[in-house]
Amino acid sequence: TVSVTLGPSRLGGSSSGVVVPDMDLLELPRPPSTSPWAYVKIAEGCDRACGFCAIPSFRGPQRSRTIESILAEVDVLARSNRSSGREGGGEDATLRAREIVLVAQDLAAYGRDQGIGQRDIIPLLTAVSQRVDWVRLLYLYPSDLTEALIDAILSTGVPYFDLSLQHTSRPVLRRMKRWGDGEQFLERIARIRELEPDAVFRSNFLIGYPGETEEDHDDLLAFMEAAQVDWCGLFTFSRESGTYAASLPDQVAPELMAERHAEASELAETITAERRLDRVGRTIEVLVDAPGVARSTGEAPEIDGIIAVPEDLTVGSLLEVLVVDAEGPDLEAVPVSDHTGG
């Protein structure tokens, strides 16, 4: 294992204030996948100016990879064969990727910096979906969730929507320099569920942004109840040096932030548990990630719950299972053939 430390440097040692990365993260070599899924980064940096975020200051503006380079990487991952080391218990076996997870700071903005159109994520998504069984998008801005993109995601057979909402109160979102409000977000979610009732949603919310009132917090809780987001990440605000939010007035006291975070977390955990319980008794397709561990299209790797399955199922296989139990964010399932005696 090689540790790589990336930090900002100034071009030519000048004091112009232009900060660039020491190494373009897009040029880092990708290690082979030891799981039947893999992340593929399609762009680095971000052109947005969210009030709480320092990413543009140290990763720079968005730089998209070419479609050709992305597809070449996907092809390599999709062709890799399971090595004999896996059968013998080796930990460095390389698996063929059955799922590709596309990631970027601003995924739907892919290609705009190259001047090749406003919706290049759609043809890229389509091309990747033709190479692997599942393709998943992580981190979509709600303002970019067009009907065309919704249709493209649903057509892949992975109805999973990771939406970067951050809050639902219009005043808070405007102080964050972000688009939308809870009502607009609910309309998008309802539209997707109208098209695909089994669609799964993930989002992150920032608690205690400067100026957040009790009314704002209640607005967020009401949205969570109404939206029934399956997977919810909750974070408390912390000042990032150099960001717009760092110098805003009306900073929320840490004790109050912690109280609001606990309240929202309890609600989020309850919603997740209830939505998982609704899956008991259903037959779903899963990908076996590791001995005894699987996921369906409704769980992103590493960040969502898992599905416990018999340990003798082949890692990297896709199969139908019957969900027999739920505990919090996790499910338990058995192969359909076992349950039917076939």
List where the protein language model places each region:
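Conserved SAM/AdoMet-binding glycine-rich loop
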Residues: 79-82, 92-215
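Short flexible coil/turn linkers enriched for glycine and charged/polar residues
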Residues: 33-36, 46-48, 167, 199, ...
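Proteins enriched for Cys/Gly/acidic motifs involved in redox and nucleic-acid/cofactor modification
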Residues: 1-82, 89-91, 95-111, 182-194, ...
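Conserved, mostly hydrophobic/aromatic
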Residues: 50, 70, 102, 137, ...
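Terminal RNA-binding accessory module
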Residues: 236, 247-342
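Short, hinge-like loop/turn segments at secondary-structure boundaries
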Residues: 118, 153-155, 220, 249-252
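Contiguous mid-protein beta-loop-alpha structural module that forms a pocket-lining wall or clamp
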Residues: 212, 228-229
